[in-house]
Amino acid sequence: MDRVGSLPDELLSHILSFLTTKEAALTSLLSKRWRYLIAFVPNLAFDDIVFLHPEEGKPERDEIRQSFMDFVDRVLALQAESPIKKFSLKCRIGVDSDRVDGWISNVLNRGVSELDLLIILGMTMEDSYRLSPKGFASKTLVKLEIGCGIDISWVAGSIFLPMLKTLVLDSVWFYVDKFETLLLALPALEELVLVDVNWLDSDVTISNASLKTLTIDSDGHLGTFSFDTPSLVYFCYSDYAAEDYPVVKMENLREARIFLLVTDNEIERVRLPINDGLEDAMDNVVLRFGHVGKLMNGIRNVEYLELSADTLEVLSLCCESMPVFKNLKSLAIKSTEGRGWQAMPVLLRNCPHLEFLLIEGLLHHVTDKCGDACDCVPREDKGRSLTSCPVNMLEIHGFRGTKKEMQMIKHFLDYFPSLKEMDIYADEDGPTNLEAPGMFEQITQLFTLYDEFYTCDVQFMVRGSLYKKLTAQCCVFKEENLPHRLVRTLG
């Protein structure tokens, strides 16, 4: 008897729960004993995509649809009233909505705790599957994921999910008042994920006293966006800036990731001098970006903050309203050549307890307002914002070996007074200056001088495969001559 076959039924059923339900059902071919194990599998995942293969000889679409629905019926019938933990249903081929109602009702009656639904009946909003009110009346549901093609715009005050802790809404339509009704029905909610939600109103408020984690990933254009979430500890926000942020109550927030989206046209407008006669065209963008300062003020208690390159550019219009981040210990910033650092000086000055700074990409757009955080523009107060920043650990990612980057690194070493460690990670995407003949050796030698001259410990991090490539093409020195204490290879 093989080792797997000797395991008890309960453990085998648990193992099968990690497979798709179709894969679990196929194990019935192994032996008679395996035939009925699927009846006790606590996790079911039905996805019609496993029935849709383009190979020659596959049945027509109607036959595939019927085969899929019959398969779900058989598995649920075989399980009868056995307990169920997770139920995932993903349908893209227009299944019978009445049968979907029956499947969802079946697992709800059996006390399902996690429900994941994606049901596409057609291509228009009118074709959306209307989730039954029973889906919002469960006393056992802990996690609910509602995906594309499902209509929940009917939500009424009679719904109540007392145990629900996680709600994920992906590509659904929503009126704001219905959304607020839904949140009121979730007294235990701790995690909310909103992905590409299509708001049918322009002013949105997220209000929930128990919410701890909020993730927003969209590309909409809202009028106002308010947050009344006093218990929130994690906030990830990726979207175009709203027109205004009237209320941002996040006093217990500990970690925030702000990835605002902007267009090149918007960036071009805000960089133009006001006296260019384009005030009317600029007013809306300038005002909207300026209101992002209210959002930043609402998250001022964070301990960890991550900003995208677009966000950093937007913050150039919020310098006067930038709050003091008195609790901030770690700051991560992504930089690109097309976006500026105008906000970097005030940001660093307003982090009085910053310990760790990560910059992904040192190259950025240079302007006459570039500030003193870099050495792009000669200034009398060069490095002033750095000298007041207590950061002791600096990580630089995406290093490409350019002269400008080397100047920036020396600038940081010169002006960060408390810097104890600097780790520089070589860029692995695409060709870089590091691959030029002799350049890798020159850079490592220069970093060696930095490491010896400054009190800061400088280390150059290179992934193993890239390290072999760079050392293999160097003809003027042997690999054993590299300063191994300085250059560290990564797995």
From Swiss-Prot:
Q: Which CDD domains match?
A: F-box_AtFBL13-like
The pathway is: Protein modification; protein ubiquitination
Checking InterPro entries in the record gives:
F-box-like_dom_sf, F-box_AtFBL13-like, F-box_dom, FBD, FBL60-like, LRR_dom_sf, LRR_FXL15/At3g58940/PEG3-like
The record's listing under SUPFAM superfamilies reads: F-box domain, RNI-like
Annotated GO biological processes are: protein ubiquitination
Q: Give all residue intervals belonging to the F-box domain.
A: 1-49
- Subcellular location, in the record's words? Nucleus
Q: Which SMART domains match?
A: FBD, FBOX
Q: A Pfam family for this UniProt protein?
A: LRR_At5g56370
Q: Does the keyword Nucleus apply?
A: yes
The entry's keywords: Nucleus, Ubl conjugation pathway
Read off the Gene3D superfamilies from this record: 1.20.1280.50, Ribonuclease Inhibitor (3.80.10.10)
Q: Write out the GO cellular component annotations.
A: nucleus
Functional summary from the UniProt entry: Component of SCF(ASK-cullin-F-box) E3 ubiquitin ligase complexes, which may mediate the ubiquitination and subsequent proteasomal degradation of target proteins.
Q: Its quaternary structure?
A: Part of a SCF (ASK-cullin-F-box) protein ligase complex. Interacts with ASK4.
Q: What is known of its domains?
A: The F-box is necessary for the interaction with ASK proteins.
Q: What is this protein called?
A: F-box protein At3g59000
- What does UniProt list as this organism's lineage? Eukaryota, Viridiplantae, Streptophyta, Embryophyta, Tracheophyta
